[in-house]
Amino acid sequence: MERCSVAQQFEDKFHRKFYYLRLSVTDVCNFKCTYCLPDGYKPSGNKNSSFLSLPEIKRVVKAFADCGTSKVRITGGEPSLRKDFTDIIHSVATTPGIKKVATTTNGYRMAKQVADWREAGLTNINVSVDSLDPRMFHQITGENKFTEVMNGIERAFEVGYEQVKVNVVLMKDLNHHELPAFLNWIKDRPIQLRFIELMQTGEMDDLFSKHHVSGVAIRNQLIANGWLLKVRSHHDGPAQVFVHPDYKGEIGLIMPYEKDFCESCNRLRVSALGKLHLCLFGEHGVELRDLLERDDQENELIERIQSQLQTKSVSHFLHDGNTGMTPHLASIGG
């Protein structure tokens, strides 16, 4: 099948080009993070709620790659809970046009499996670590697995990863005071520490009002202490990344409530049930699964994605308290 011409690069009516696909492969997670799945994973009960198969994943990734996508992040839920996770990595990594294959994981299985992930073609890893205090880690995640996750990060370096990104969801009265400890941790480690503002979702209004804290205070602190903003490349995410000559690590800030946050949007999302989401906080998903049954449906699939892109909003509406249809972040992979 012919690749898309340059004119068919996935692009919306605001001339934003989409180089980055966030592909969820499961909604299931074995952690119970307060800001995501505080009561743990509960199946939807829908008969038709099986997650994307490996052939379906291959087809959707190929369509995106043929239209200019060069980076795929495999998300969940917890993607490593899929028994075929390594096969998924290999399938994505061997798709012509895909240059970066990343995953976001809770790190629970990393110590045992990360060598296999790397061999399969995983180029980048993000691990969620919301506290360096084992007791607070347990309180936030619902699991007493701090040591296992830390061992997983060290193992990633041992098998050859030059950098690991660590995601920290900022929460007032829980972990927002831990900046000095985190800075000390990354001083001699090539970790990009990413502080993510707590985001409002449909089921988390109370948590948001109680624990939301802006990343602006951290940014001001970093700048005052000699940290410098890095230039962003076209396939990077929305993080403002800061570097310091005395630190091996970096700091990223993800602040969705910041003005013009959506201006540099370069990613699209496909859920584990095969729906296209134009925005993490959009009103609805677009069914793609009926066009993932056969290889010869690719042109139709591309046309559907391209036409839906023309309906993508210029911005989310979080400032109006409109969180869209996202009940929790596990539902479409954050």
UniProtKB/Swiss-Prot annotation:
Gene Ontology biological process terms, A to Z: Mo-molybdopterin cofactor biosynthetic process
Enzymatic reactions: GTP + AH2 + S-adenosyl-L-methionine = (8S)-3',8-cyclo-7,8-dihydroguanosine 5'-triphosphate + 5'-deoxyadenosine + L-methionine + A + H(+)
EC number: 4.1.99.22
Binding site for S-adenosyl-L-methionine: 35, 77, 128, 199
Keywords: 4Fe-4S, GTP-binding, Iron, Iron-sulfur, Lyase, Metal-binding, Molybdenum cofactor biosynthesis, Nucleotide-binding, S-adenosyl-L-methionine
Segments forming a coiled coil: none
Pathway assigned in UniProt: Cofactor biosynthesis; molybdopterin biosynthesis
SUPFAM superfamilies in UniProt: Radical SAM enzymes (SSF102114)
Annotated binding of [4Fe-4S] cluster 2, by residue: 262, 265, 279
CC cofactor: [4Fe-4S] cluster
Source organism, top-level taxon: Bacteria
Binding site for [4Fe-4S] cluster 1: 29, 33, 36
Gene Ontology molecular-function annotations: 4 iron, 4 sulfur cluster binding; cyclic pyranopterin monophosphate synthase activity; GTP 3',8'-cyclase activity; GTP binding; metal ion binding; S-adenosyl-L-methionine binding
Annotated ranges, domain Radical SAM core: 13-239
Comment on bound cofactor: Binds 2 [4Fe-4S] clusters. Binds 1 [4Fe-4S] cluster coordinated with 3 cysteines and an exchangeable S-adenosyl-L-methionine and 1 [4Fe-4S] cluster coordinated with 3 cysteines and the GTP-derived substrate.
PROSITE patterns: RADICAL_SAM
Pfam family, one: Fer4_12
SMART domains per record: Elp3
Protein's job: Catalyzes the cyclization of GTP to (8S)-3',8-cyclo-7,8-dihydroguanosine 5'-triphosphate.
Family the entry assigns: Belongs to the radical SAM superfamily. MoaA family.
HAMAP family to which the protein is assigned, alphabetical: MoaA_B (MF_01225_B)
Subunit structure as annotated in this protein's UniProt entry: Monomer and homodimer.
Protein name, UniProt field: GTP 3',8-cyclase
Species for this entry: Vibrio parahaemolyticus serotype O3:K6 (strain RIMD 2210633)
